[in-house]
Amino acid sequence: MAAPRLPPARALSGVMVPAPIQDLEALRALTALFKEQRNRETAPRTIFQRVLDILKKSSHAVELACRDPSQVENLASSLQLITECFRCLRNACIECSVNQNSIRNLDAIGVAVDLILLFRELRVEQESLLTAFRCGLQFLGNIASRNEDSQSIVWVHAFPELFLSCLNHPDKKIVAYSSMILFTSLNHERMKELEENLNIAIDVIDAYQKHPESEWPFLIITDLFLKSPELVQAMFPKLNNQERVTLLDLMIAKITSDEPLTKDDIPVFLRHAELIASTFVDQCKTVLKLASEEPPDDEEALATIRLLDVLCEMTVNTELLGYLQVFPGLLERVIDLLRVIHVAGKETTNIFSNCGCVRAEGDISNVAEGFKSHLIRLIGNLCYKNKDNQDKVNELDGIPLILDNCNISDSNPFLTQWVIYAIRNLTEDNSQNQDLIAKMEEQGLADASLLKKVGFEVEKKGEKLILKSTRDTPKP
């Protein structure tokens, strides 16, 4: 590669040009050359040493500005050089492990991290400073890309301070680039270190919440966090309601993805199922606050609803269903909660009444009806081909409760759909439950029109009442 030389000074048209200007021109030429793979592969190590020398020298001005804020105004030329040094090194590392190794062995990673931390310390949002900041992060991302040795050094220098400084930065590009570095550097062992620095993990959740279009926070959560049940269990209690909803939404997205959970995913999601089910059993009654006269906490209700949503999606998976069908207290708590909500909606006018409606977020337009629908859906899932649970619902008087919810919710076809599904699963190969519903109709506790609405009819053969289905089972 015919690289430009970097002498201390030179004359242009008889005028001596200061070294910083000359360096800047040469650096820009190098940056352009390193866009080509052949130039990257033939670059001599001495060039990187010279670039690093310029970077170190220029960083002194930033150090001075950190000690004396009045010097910030004098940073322009130094920031230009720093930016171009980072661009040059960034380009040199693209798909070139030889350059990655050469630059790493010059301790450029430590110099870059120290300088980036100085940028954050300045807390000045000048565009020139932000540009240098971004280019520094891009360099760290490129030198670590597909290079385990570089990833290790980046981790040593960057964790935890750089991530704590950058993941919550107001500039979305800085958030994205620091997320890229975190994603690139994390491995199984380093995930354990993250468990001891949960603020970083929470900052990633917040970053995705603020910048859902950014792929790096999304990938960190879905490809790394959700594969570490230990991290999720440690982090979940420390999340606020909005952060919980964000994490649970991504868990739902993972479960319902076009790509089914793999054999390796199942043990991990069984651990997640334990966390979600136990949290729901312990905290689900917080949704009853919505029936109070005080203004409801929509965020708390939405977090509770998302727990239920996750359980509904988990119980569609055969491996997870078996675990949740026998989870202690889950079915009982769901029936109990459905009963309390149903009674609350009948006794007073509140969000659980037919007319109650609260706008929450996204596709949830009616919190109460959606919550009841999913409670009934979960009961149906938990009773799928499980006679013990079918009988338990009967013992807890859950069948009349489910039918009565359908009776008062003519305006909610979504709820009716899940009542049909639940009754179908409750009566499948269960003559006792079939007889109960048939007798309810005979005694006037369930009229024929209601049973017809949910897809059943009672037929009398001699002295025996037979419950018959009139439609196919809807998909869960």
Curated annotation (Swiss-Prot):
Entries under InterPro entries matching the protein: ARM-like, ARM-type_fold, Ataxin-10/CTR86_families, Ataxin-10_domain
Sites of Omega-N-methylarginine modification: R10
Chief location bin: cytoplasm
This protein's name: Ataxin-10
PTMs per UniProt: Polyubiquitinated.
Gene: ATXN10
Native species: Pongo abelii (Sumatran orangutan)
Oligomer and partners: Homooligomer. Interacts with GNB2. Interacts with IQCB1. Interacts with OGT.
PTM sites of type Phosphoserine: S13, S78, S431
Modified residues (Phosphothreonine): T83
GO biological process: cell division; neuron projection development; regulation of cytokinesis
